[in-house]
Amino acid sequence: MTYRSRWLLPVLVILAALQLAACGDSEADQRKAFVAFLQSVQSQQDGKLPTLTEEQKKNFGNFTNDYAILTTFSQQFNQAVSGSLTPMLGQISRIRVPKDYLTQRDDLRQSIGAMNLLSQHVKAAKVQADNAHRLLKQPEEVQIPYERLYARTVIQPTNALLPAIPNAIAFAQSLIQIGDFLQAQGDQAVFNGSSVQFRTPQQVAQYNSLVAALPLQQQNLMNALRGITGVNYP
């Protein structure tokens, strides 16, 4: 019995070593697969994050949780934008003739309320992502491509969107102001397709003054939106 136990000991040691080696190989394979995936996503021009398949989740192991930080922020960001900025841009695009200032102003007022919350929602989502990001313990070969994708997915969209919010609100407020002015003129404002006529030179001057401020505000908004993936000025 003593002889048998001594003989089995090196066998058990060898088996344990083989198990550790297999585990090490598995982690290396997961790193390699995840790095290749990150590089593939980074090379895509549309900036979208693909949903992981069940096979990819298995191949990436715990790195699946690292990727979830990116997808969670992206979903929260897109949801916040689609509930505020996107509808506002749609309303702005429907203003084509002077009478449209009247028909769109109430919807624009509601959109401004949603836009005032957009900054809070995006900042909260970024804080959540940053907190999870700081806790990551990644090997260097994973960290380098992951940091690039984190910057593109989280940092850059946030930095581009936040300055665009006041630009969008200011532009919408100017459009509402024109609509309110036209409403106040009553039947003294006569709409004729792409033009509007007034009874007095003072009305014409005031209307022209309001409209004159729009091109610069519109250009500022367009410039701000260029840095936000998936958001385009209509």
Task: Tell what function each PLM region has.
Residues 101-197:
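Extended amphipathic alpha-helical interaction segments
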Residues 63, 67-70, 74-77, 115-118, ...:
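Amphipathic alpha-helical coiled-coil segments
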Residues 191-234:
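Extracytoplasmic/luminal low-complexity segments enriched in Pro/Gly and acidic/polar residues
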Residues 65, 173, 177-180, 216, ...:
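Extended, non-membrane alpha-helical segments enriched in charged/polar residues
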Residues 54, 58, 68, 106, ...:
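Generic alpha-helical secondary structure signal
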